[in-house]
Amino acid sequence: ILRRLVAQGRLGVKSGQGFYPHAHPEAGWEDSPVKLERIDRIAIAWLDRPPANSISPEVVDALRRVWDEVSGSENIRVLVIASANPMLFCAGADIKSFTKIDADGGRRLTDQVHGLLRDMERSSIATIAAVNAIAFGGGCELAMACDIRIAAQSASFGQPEINLGIIPGFGGTQRLPRLIGEARALEMNLTGDPISAQAAYEYGLANRVVPDHELWDTALAWAHKLSDQAPRAVKQIKRVSAAGDLDAGIEAEKQAFAKVFGSEDAREGITAFLQKRNPSFRGK
């Protein structure tokens, strides 16, 4: 029956809906690892870098291009960040690319990402993360920088960087405790263990948890609601709600990340991950 409905164009890509959300990127964005789509006053940034939507320098550049395009538009009120891969949201940073950069390169990368995420947080544009499955490491940090996080029931969140001998570099040591409290954030960051969508909701990391097949409709419903709000009021609510020492905390995280990233343990953790073996950390 499903094959027949797809053949008839009543389900699947031809129908415009499919069994899971399907990106319809604007011209010029078809080959980008992050694709831009617009629906009325809503922009959608589709993470589309197979196989795992891993965050590489190219993905960071693409996210920045999307944000510059969206924030420069007078019509866009909401940005939804979603995955074009139905099996995951974002598995984290591209570990292989880490082997090609030194401590200075790592610092430049974190500067770029933090600059982007802080721009998102300071903007009058509301941001929504539609987390359909795995959101680990940088993927979790990207979601945390959004104003609203809608999670599918099968989603999971985690900060596994410590298993590589490094620390979260995109805000995980700062935004996570602000969202779920210091004790739970320390547990996640020190163990690297993921949590379920339901736990994320109970902790305060996810605003809503919905059945997988309702995720996209729910995210769009939130987006349409937020797009009707006054942009100046949105910006000031976001600004006042985030008042505090987040910038100082992020600066401390950036310095700590660069220091740890250049360590022998970090090289061992990354190498062990790529070689699919357990790391042997020596405290150096």
List where the protein language model places each region.
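Glycine-rich beta-to-alpha active-site loop
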Residues: 116-164, 194
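Short helix- or helix-capping micro-motifs
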Residues: 92-93, 176, 184-190
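Conserved CoA-thioester-binding segment of acyl-CoA-metabolizing enzymes
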Residues: 28-82, 86, 104, 118
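NAD(P)-dependent Rossmann-like dehydrogenase/reductase catalytic/cofactor-binding core
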Residues: 1-39, 57, 268-270, 275
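Glycine- (often His-adjacent) and acidic-residue-rich active-site loop
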Residues: 83-118, 135, 165
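C-terminal long alpha-helix characteristic of the crotonase
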Residues: 150-155, 197, 206-252, 258-264, ...
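Acidic, divalent-metal-coordinating active-site segment for phosphoryl/phosphodiester hydrolysis
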Residues: 192-199
